[in-house]
Amino acid sequence: MVLKREDCWYKSTCTYELCANCIRYFEMKYLMEHSGLSKKRQQPISLKATQDKDAFKLLNDIRLDIVNFVNNGESLYIYSEYTGNGKTSWAIKLLLRFFDQIWAGNGFRQRGYFIHVPVFLNQAKNFEDNKARQQMLKMLSEIDLVVWDDIASTKLSDYDIQQLLTVIDQRISDGLANIYTGNLTSHNAMINSLGNRLASRIWNTSTLVEFKGKDRRAEW
C-alpha cells in the first residue's frame, strides 16, 4: 500500500512525499484507528470565537496544557441548552491535541477514545459476544482519556445509568481523565436525567464550561 502525504495529519507542514518511513505517521494512524473517531472527525475544524469567547479561551488554555490535564486525571463538562454550537467539536479538538502531544514514543498503545453515549448504551444492550463487551468495558476503565459525547441528552433508564456509573466511577477513582458534553445546564437537571450518584460524580469533579451561543454550524 502506498502511503501518500495527502493522507497525513501533518500534510500542511510535512515535507515527505510518502509516509512509508515516517514513524509519526504510523503512531498517529494507530491512535486514530483506535480512537472511536470516524475518518471525517479525525481532521479538526477551525472554531471561531465569535460567541462564547470566555468559554473558548478557557478551552484553549486546557488544549495547550492537555497532557497535564490528562496526567492529572482531570475532567471537563462542556454543556449548552443549544445544539450545534461546538461542544462536540471542542471535545474532539482536545482529544486530537492530546494525540498530537503524546504520539512520540507511544508505540502502539491505545490512549484516548471517543464515545457517542446514546450509541454506546444501545450497543451495550445488544452485544452478542460477552467477551467483546467485557473487553470494551475494560478498555474504557483503563484508557488515559475518554470523551463521553452527549452524555446528558435524555433521561436514562436505571440500567443505562448503572452501565455508565460502573465505568465512570472507576475512572474517576483511578485518576483517569474524562471529557463530557451534554445539554443539561444545572446539577438538578443532571440528577433528574442521570440519577444523583452519577450526576454528582460528573458535575462535582469537572471543570464546567457553558456555551450560550446558538447553532453555529453554518459558520464552520
Where would I find each of the regions flagged by the language model?
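A short, basic N-terminal segment
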Residues: 1-64, 207-213, 217-220
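Conserved alpha-helical scaffold flanking the Walker A/P-loop in AAA+ ATPase domains
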Residues: 64-67, 124-146, 162, 166-170
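Conserved catalytic network of the ASCE P-loop NTPase/AAA+ motor domain
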Residues: 69-70, 105-107, 138-141, 169-174, ...
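Walker A/P-loop nucleotide-binding motif
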Residues: 71-92
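Post-Walker A helix-loop "phosphate-sensing" segment adjacent to the P-loop in P-loop NTPases
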Residues: 95-112
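A short hydrophobic beta-strand->loop->alpha-helix junction that borders the nucleotide-binding pocket
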Residues: 109, 114-124
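Loop/turn-to-beta-strand initiation segments
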Residues: 111, 142-145, 174-180
